[in-house]
A protein has these predicted regions:
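Short, small-residue-biased leader/transition segments that mark boundaries at the very start
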Residues: 2-3
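A generic fold-level signal
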Residues: 6-7, 30
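Conserved NTP phosphate-binding and transfer environment spanning the P-loop NTPase/kinase superfamily
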Residues: 22-170
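Loop/turn-to-beta-strand initiation segments
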Residues: 8-12, 34
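Short beta->alpha connector loops
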Residues: 17-20
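N-terminal Rossmann-like NAD(P) cofactor-binding module of classical short-chain dehydrogenase/reductase
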Residues: 13-14, 103
């Protein structure tokens, strides 16, 4: 219905994790679509043999965002992560190749900037929690990176979506 009310030569932006799903935009002809896929595509390694998994970047972002803005603990987010991954495999990744353009939102300094925020959140996971092994693994992983103070990050940085202090209001 929104599409039918659009003015001639206007732009309709559909944003979100399901925006590339063809069922969502079936009423719009493909020739009128320009699809952009934005994702963390980590391209750095710890050494010649150990690449940083994209999922670690994404999980750390989510742990921080869920804690700061949704009131979830790291334990809660880690416990939900397998379900999130199954949902991605079913509803997001199959459609990423439909994109006309891909944007890699990973930044070389990201893990150093996230470390200061992530460590105390991950440290709240108790040893007796089943999620402790994953929290401990992430804490050890973060030790590879020096801290970068977030005060130097501009308000328009994508990392502000997770760390807070951004220029945009959601």
């Amino acid at each position: 219905d929104v599409y039918k009310r659009q003015q001639k030569n206007s732009v309709l932006v559909i944003e979100g994790i399901h925006a590339l799903n063809p069922e969502l935009t079936s009423m719009i002809e493909d020739c009128y679509k320009y699809r952009i896929y934005v994702s963390v595509l980590t391209s750095i390694s710890l050494d010649n043999h150990n690449w940083i998994p994209t999922t670690d970047n994404r999980l750390l972002r989510r742990i921080i965002r869920d804690y700061r803005f949704r009131g979830y603990s790291a334990r809660d987010t880690i416990a939900r992560w397998p379900s999130v991954r199954r949902g991605e495999d079913k509803w997001i990744f199959p459609y990423q190749e439909n994109a006309d353009a891909m944007f890699n939102s990973a930044m070389l300094y990201e893990l150093a900037a996230l470390r200061k925020e992530a460590e105390p959140i991950l440290g709240e996971v108790r040893e007796c929690d089943p999620e402790n092994a994953e929290a401990y693994r992430l804490l050890r992983f973060l030790r590879y990176f020096n801290y970068i103070p977030d005060v130097g990050l501009p308000g328009t940085s994508l990392l502000r979506e997770f760390l807070g202090g951004g220029s945009f209001r959601y």
